[in-house]
Amino acid sequence: MAKICGIDEAGRGALAGPLSVAACVLNSEISGLNDSKKLTAKRREELFKKITKSSNFLIAYFSNAQIDELGLSECLRRALKLFKAHFESFEIIYDGNLDYGVGITTMIKADGKVAGVSAASILAKVSRDRLMNGWDKFYPAYGFAGHKGYGTKSHLDAIAKFGYSDFHRKSFVIKPKLAQSSLF
């Protein structure tokens, strides 16, 4: 059986910040791997260190401006195409149900089933979270370190009070009903 290159992303549904897409080929077994959303932040950091020391990986970032210009689907397609070219001798498994025309294997919930995809999930999440923690220092009023750019009540409240920052995705529209019930 061919060695597996797992791919997953973080930040897909966020209102601010980048989309982080990671590809990972594990060179040794790492215990405790799972979908990054099912792990604590502390455990993700521990596993991130192990993964980066014992695997081949790439992480692609797409800024909020690139997401606004290209759209999420095109950003994902470009990352998958890059990873397919870089890891061409591996079986590539992407967590999801769309291959974006790239010709790779997709698997729903692969981040909880395939070790390489779990590792990619952790790489994407931890690297993006670290970026959001850094951006929190430039935009403290928005609380990025807490919600990581996702549409929590506190984030929606900050947008209502301060407007969009340069780090927000302008193409992501907050639905009026949600804005009225959550923002005011």
Curated annotation (Swiss-Prot):
UniProt keyword Heme, yes or no: no
CDD domains: RNase_HII_bacteria_HII_like
Residue ranges of domain RNase H type-2 in the record: 2-184
GO CC annotation, single: ribonuclease H2 complex
Biological process according to GO: DNA replication, removal of RNA primer; mismatch repair
Keywords: Cytoplasm, Endonuclease, Hydrolase, Manganese, Metal-binding, Nuclease
Cofactor: how and how many bound: Manganese or magnesium. Binds 1 divalent metal ion per monomer in the absence of substrate. May bind a second metal ion after substrate binding.
Pfam families: RNase_HII
Binding site residues for a divalent metal cation: D8, E9, D95
Subcellular location(s) per record: Cytoplasm
UniProt-listed SUPFAM superfamilies: Ribonuclease H-like
Catalytic reactions on record: Endonucleolytic cleavage to 5'-phosphomonoester
Required cofactor(s): Mn(2+); Mg(2+)
HAMAP family: RNase_HII_B
Family classification: Belongs to the RNase HII family.
Function: Endonuclease that specifically degrades the RNA of RNA-DNA hybrids.
Name assigned to this protein: Ribonuclease HII
Encoding gene per record: rnhB
